[in-house]
Amino acid sequence: MAKKAKGNRVQVILECTEHKESGMPGMSRYITTKNRKNTTQRLELMKYNPVLKKMTLHKEIK
């Protein structure tokens, strides 16, 4: 039997960088998908952080 190929689209978690440094309780995380072939580097997106009430940089975590 042939093996099932892994898909190119994978699920990734984005975590706020400013919130981690601020020391406030809680965390801001988003789950999204990316195409493994087109985007080989880690994602960095500006997303809304409801705790800090502003747009902040969210980076992909393992």
Swiss-Prot record:
It holds the Pfam family Ribosomal_L33. Keywords: Ribonucleoprotein, Ribosomal protein. InterPro entries: Ribosomal_bL33 (IPR001705), Ribosomal_bL33_sf (IPR038584), Ribosomal_zn-bd (IPR011332). One of its GO terms (cellular component) is ribosome. GO terms for biological process: translation. Belongs to the bacterial ribosomal protein bL33 family. This is Large ribosomal subunit protein bL33. It comes from Parabacteroides distasonis (strain ATCC 8503 / DSM 20701 / CIP 104284 / JCM 5825 / NCTC 11152).
